[in-house]
């Protein structure tokens, strides 16, 4: 079976980590090897860039274009050093976020032109597209409430409600325009989200469990 690149997307507080735990449980049950990773981050250098973007400790504003480029510098490291090699070896890759998050957060939220972001993906990631995107949709107010229960808000989580409304809109538009993305209502119970994820994976892997 050809290796798959599966990405979980969604706003902060949508439950991506929980969803990934369901994907892990499913793949392990079906004896499918996989690595589990995240963005921003995924490699040592990418994690350093993540920390700079989310927890800027310097008395210097990060421009929206700079934010995008720092995230993409980490993404290139992540893709070339971890994602692509794993897929080439026949190992499935499951990632908490990929380039859709830049389209939504930096494109929708920050207002960076989407064409710039697509160009980065085409030029530096060989136009890599996930085999499956599971988008967890949630109202930004509920998402931020959930996120704040986990810990102190990071730099992006402090961006405000309007930012997240714009971010959500781009996510939903991306799902509508994609043939390999499925939206799940993340406000539903954990049990219902788990059930939907298993059904999606059954169909994707052509399994009948």
UniProtKB/Swiss-Prot annotation:
Transmembrane ranges, per UniProt, are none
Gene (name only): tmk
Q: What EC class does the entry list?
A: transferase
Which domain of life does this protein belong to?
Bacteria
Q: What does this protein do?
A: Phosphorylation of dTMP to form dTDP in both de novo and salvage pathways of dTTP synthesis.
* Organism expressing this protein natively: Francisella tularensis subsp. mediasiatica (strain FSC147)
Is Transferase among this UniProt entry's keywords?
A: yes
Q: Which GO terms describe its cellular component?
A: cytosol
Q: Which PROSITE patterns match?
A: THYMIDYLATE_KINASE
The protein's name in its UniProt record: Thymidylate kinase
EC number of the protein: 2.7.4.9
Taxonomy, top ranks, is:
Bacteria, Pseudomonadati, Pseudomonadota, Gammaproteobacteria, Thiotrichales
